[in-house]
Every structure is written in structure tokens, then in C-alpha cells.
Amino acid sequence: MATIEKKKSGTTDLTVGKPLFQILRFALPLVLGTLFQQLYSFADTVIVGRCLGTDALGAVGTTYSLNFLILGFVQGACVGFGIPAAETFGAKDKDGLQKYLLNGALLCLVLSVVFTVLTTLMAGPLLRLIHTPEQLYADAVLYIRIIFLGIPATVLYNYASSVLRALGDSRHPFYFLLVASVVNILLDYLFIVPLGMGVDGAALATVLSQLLSGELCAYWFFTRTAKLEGLSFRQPRTLLSAEHCKRLGY
């Protein structure tokens, strides 16, 4: 019965069955998810270029390097927080797993607040630093500031999906990302064409779709995965101990 429930929840036990098959089964959604994440930028590029013109397209393209640098760091940190969770889950250390999950969530909260404030305030100077053309500057600042204001949504998806993968479920984060990618395309079109928004519409569509994928991952974790694994976060836990911070930082 437990095995059936785990299959329904999407959890894969890599120690059961043929190793190569299980690894490929777990890794395929990761590869496909990486490809679909590119749809966010691709959808913005295509719809902005077709509907708003070359200057708007240039403004969005100018922000790519900053977007990649800042959000890439945030995503990497969130994925890193899932590593000790995976180790304790594999060791069947439920108490340690709960502590790492709570510590990781708290650090993600701090990370999202700090990066949101700093990057939003520094968006203009950073664009000047990379010599953004004057005719593109206003739209570029508007676009990247909205993206940076959406860092909490990025953190939510990447941490929640990292936790699900750490517990053996790589399929549902991919499913939720696929849904969010489709929603992003629809919102891009809605905001830019019928509603007449500019590059801010494209940025807002990206943030909202990322928020949707994060909420879906979090909902699945708390309603299915956490219950199945017998995890409870109601009892007080030791947060941010030196050992846990060191391992999370690693």
C-alpha cells in the first residue's frame, strides 16, 4: 500500500528496480524542465518583438545578462538548500529532514527579501554599468524591476521544487512548470495585446506564472508528499544551528 501511495505522489525510490532505468526516469523531467524554463524568456521575446517593436525587444534583451546573473544565483542557492534534505531523507532521518526543510525555508525567505530590495534599488545603476543604450533604458529598467520584484516567486518555485526532487519526486515540478509556461504565454498575449501594456506586461506575466508554479509545488508538498512521509512542522524545531547553516551553505 505504501509503495502504491508513493507512486501516486510521484516519489521515485532510486534503490528499487534497475538503477539505469530509475536514474533516467528521475532525470528526464529535470532535463525537460530546464528546456521549458527557457519558454519564459522565449515567449517574452517573441510576443514583445511582434507586438511592441524592435526597441521594446531590445530593452528586454538588454536585461538578459542581469536576469541570468541574479536569478541564476538565487536558483542555485535554492537548489543547494535541497541537498542536505535529500541526504537526510535517504538516511531516513525524519527529524533532521524537518529541521533542514525549515532552515532552508527561513534562509530562502531572508534571501528573497534581501535580493528583492537590493536588486530593485540597483536595477538602474546596473543597467548603466552594462552600457544600456539610452533609447532602451526606460523600458529595460521597467522590465527588470518587475522581474526583480518577483524574486520571491522565483525563490518559492525553486525551493519547493528542489524539496520535492530531494524527496524523490521530479515529475510534479515538471508538470507544474509546464502549466506555468502555458499560462505565461497566455498572460503575455493578454497583457500586451488586449490590455495594451508594454514590456511591463511581459514581465508581470513572467512573475505571475512563476508564482503559480511555486504555489502548485508548495501545495503538492503539503497536501501529498509531507503527509505521505509523515512530516509535521507544527512542533518547535531548532532553527539555524551552526551545523545546519554550514551544511545548507555547502
Indicate where each model-derived feature is located.
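Alpha-helical transmembrane segments of multi-pass membrane transporters/permeases
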Residues: 95, 108, 163-189, 200, ...
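Helix-terminus/linker motif at the lipid-water interface of multi-pass membrane proteins
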Residues: 35, 39-58, 127-134, 190-197, ...
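Generic alpha-helical transmembrane segments of integral inner-membrane proteins
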Residues: 31, 35, 39, 43, ...
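Residue-level signal for short hydrophobic patches within transmembrane helices
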Residues: 16, 20-39, 43, 66, ...
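Small-residue hotspots at the loop-to-helix junctions and early N-terminal turns
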Residues: 52-65, 144, 203
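Small-residue-rich hydrophobic transmembrane alpha-helices
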Residues: 57-117, 154-173
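Interfacial helix-capping/hinge residues at the ends of transmembrane alpha-helices
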Residues: 45, 82-83, 123-124, 161, ...
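Short alpha-helical transmembrane segments in multi-pass integral membrane proteins
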Residues: 1-27, 85-150, 194-250
